Design a protein with these regions (language model features):
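Acidic, polar low-complexity linker/tail segments
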Residues: 3-56, 62-69
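Von Willebrand factor
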Residues: 48-166, 169-172
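Acidic/histidine-rich, surface-exposed loop or edge segments in extracytoplasmic proteins
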Residues: 50-64, 133-140, 214-219
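Hydrophobic beta-strand segments of well-ordered beta-sheets in folded domains
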Residues: 53-57, 87-92, 168-170, 205-219, ...
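N-terminal post-signal-peptidase region of extra-cytosolic proteins
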Residues: 72-79, 155, 193-201
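VWA/integrin I-like adhesion module and closely mimicked acidic/polar interface patches used
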Residues: 177-231
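Von Willebrand factor A/integrin I-like adhesion domains
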Residues: 221, 225-253
Length: 253
C-alpha cells in the first residue's frame, strides 16, 4: 500500500509543478503587459502612445487673495486634481513675462498610478510626494507684482499642450485684469485702448486650438474696475483665440 501511494504522489508532482509554472507565467505576462515606462523625474509616460490627459493651472499672483477666496480656490483645484486619472499630467504656472521665453512650470508631474508594478512602499511615497508638492505650489498664489501679463502667459502655457494628449485643459485663477505693455485694464478706457492696439493684440494672441478653458474668476478690491465688462471681454477674446471656454466661475469672499 505504501509503495502504491508513493507512485500516486509522484504522478501528481509534475502536474502540480506545471500548473505553478503556467500561473507564474501568467502573472509575469500581466506585470510586463501593464507596465508603462515613465520619466523618473516627472513620472510621466515616455511614449506618446501612453500620453493621457493634461491639465495646466495658471495662477495670478499679482495681488493677495482673501483667506476665503484662497480656501475656495484650493478646494476647487484639489477636487479637479482628484478627478485626474493615473498618468494624467499636471503643470502649475504663475503669470509672468513670457514674450521672449516660455514660462517654466513650478510643478510638472503626472499623477502616480496606485496600481503600478512598483513596491507598495514606493507607490505610497510617490503619492505622498505628489500631494505635498501640490500643496506647496498652490501657496505661490499669494504674492504681489506690479504687472500682470495674462495674455502672453496663456499663450505660453497653451504652447506646452500638444494635441497628442487625449484631453487638454487650462484652468486660469485670476481677476483677469491685464496690466502689461499690451494694455492696462486699470485705465477707464482700456477697451478702446486695446482696440487701437489691435495689431499688437493679435501678435500676442494665444493659439488655443480647441483647448478647454476654465476660469476661477477672483476679483480683488480694485476701485473703478467693471469686472463684468472684464469678464465678458475675456470670454470673447479666448473664444476668438480658439479656446473652448467651458465656464467662468466667480470666487467671492
Amino acid at each position: 500500500m505504501v509503495r502504491r501511494k508513493a507512485k500516486k504522489e509522484s504522478f501528481f508532482v509534475p502536474i502540480l509543478f506545471g500548473l505553478l509554472i503556467v500561473i507564474g507565467f501568467g502573472f509575469t505576462y500581466k506585470h510586463f503587459e501593464n507596465k508603462i515606462e515613465v520619466n523618473q523625474r516627472t513620472g510621466c509616460p515616455i511614449s506618446n502612445v501612453d500620453q493621457r490627459s493634461a491639465l495646466s493651472l495658471l495662477l495670478d499672483s499679482s495681488e493677495p487673495y482673501t483667506p476665503v477666496q484662497m480656501s475656495n480656490i484650493v478646494n476647487r483645484i484639489q477636487n479637479k486634481v482628484n478627478s485626474l486619472k493615473s498618468y494624467d499630467r499636471l503643470r502649475i504656472y504663475t503669470i509672468g513675462v513670457a514674450e521672449e521665453e516660455l514660462l517654466v512650470p513650478h510643478f510638472d508631474f503626472c499623477k502616480p498610478d496606485p496600481e503600478s508594478a512598483e513596491s507598495p512602499l514606493m507607490r505610497n511615497w510617490k503619492a505622498g510626494n505628489f500631494e505635498q508638492r501640490l500643496r506647496d505650489t498652490l501657496g505661490l498664489m499669494q504674492g504681489s507684482r506690479d504687472n500682470s501679463h495674462i495674455i502672453t502667459s496663456i499663450g505660453s502655457v497653451a504652447s506646452e499642450l500638444p494635441d497628442s494628449y487625449d484631453e487638454r485643459t487650462i484652468i486660469i485663477v485670476s481677476d483677469l485684469v491685464e496690466n502689461s505693455n499690451i494694455g492696462s485694464m486699470y485705465s477707464p478706457n482700456w477697451q478702446e485702448a486695446l482696440s487701437d492696439r489691435n495689431s499688437l493684440l493679435d501678435a500676442r494672441r494665444p493659439m488655443l486650438g480647441g483647448i478647454r478653458i476654465e476660469i476661477l474668476f477672483a476679483p480683488r478690491a480694485n476701485a473703478g474696475i467693471d469686472f463684468r465688462r472684464v469678464r465678458d471681454w475675456w470670454r470673447t477674446f479666448l473664444s476668438d483665440s480658439g479656446g473652448m471656454v467651458a465656464n467662468i466661475d466667480p470666487i467671492s469672499g
